Amino acid sequence: MTLNKTDRIVITLGKQIVHGKYVPGSPLPAEAELCEEFATSRNIIREVFRSLMAKRLIEMKRYRGAFVAPRNQWNYLDTDVLQWVLENDYDPRLISAMSEVRNLVEPAIARWAAERATSSDLAQIESALNEMIANNQDREAFNEADIRYHEAVLQSVHNPVLQQLSIAISSLQRAVFERTWMGDEANMPQTLQEHKALFDAIRHQDGDAAEQAALTMIASSTRRLKEIT
């Protein structure tokens, strides 16, 4: 995907914040300095600030400019923020927090999917699974299929309130998948088997097996995340 100038500056400044060049509570350079540094206009820098505010990485203070927000206010459900944090430093507390959220949400989704999935839902899940199998050596295509797989499982629950959380859930999953993809023979067959086990449990309307399959999947990805972080 081609990034425009605004996106590139957002990534640069976002990483600088997360990686500690600008610490929480400290000011970012003034607009004029950033315009000179990135050879761009004030309008572009203001767009960048809006994007960083949406990620809750900065706060704007009247007449004073942009300041780095406290770390506990950062939007960890933003895929970019989570990726930048994970690539910068191993934080066992963050890994634990991510696992807690997934363990809380995904097994329940799996159980409800087993109870409620229609034939059309099953076809969507199976289609995504087949794409994962077909693209198991293509990191980007595999991860996109993996996200579609989990989104299809979530959609099969038919809970409109839960579906409103799908963006947040998918952001968390996407950040994890981007870091834990392993195409080697020691990991990929297990990953595919775990996804097939969940699909089979949903297809057979076995809520207990679906819940256990989700827990197994989370445990595996958490293990891989700890190994590489």
Swiss-Prot record:
Keywords: DNA-binding, Metal-binding, Repressor, Transcription, Transcription regulation, Zinc. Changing residue 51 to L: Loss of DNA-binding ability and repressor activity. Changing residue 42 to C: Loss of DNA-binding ability and repressor activity. Changing residue 146 to A: Shows increased DNA binding but can be slightly reverted in the presence of D-galactonate. Strong decrease in binding to D-galactonate. Changing residue 46 to A: Loss of DNA-binding ability and repressor activity. D-galactonate binds DgoR and induces a conformational change in the protein, which decreases its affinity for DNA and consequently derepresses transcription of the dgoRKADT operon. GO terms for molecular function: cis-regulatory region sequence-specific DNA binding; DNA binding; DNA-binding transcription repressor activity; identical protein binding; ligand-modulated transcription factor activity; metal ion binding; transcription cis-regulatory region binding. Disruption phenotype: Deletion of the gene leads to faster growth of E.coli in D-galactonate and results in a considerable increase in the expression of dgo genes. Changing residue 102 to A: Shows a decreased binding to both DNA and D-galactonate. Zn(2+) binds at residues 146, 150, 195. It holds the Pfam family GntR. GO terms for biological process: negative regulation of DNA-templated transcription initiation. PROSITE patterns: HTH_GNTR. It comes from the Bacteria. Changing residue 224 to A/E: Shows a decreased binding to both DNA and D-galactonate. Contains an N-terminal DNA binding region and a C-terminal effector-binding cavity. The C-terminal region also contains a metal binding site. The divalent metal ion is not directly involved in the interaction with DNA, but it plays an important role in interaction with D-galactonate. Homodimer. This is Galactonate operon transcriptional repressor. The gene is dgoR.
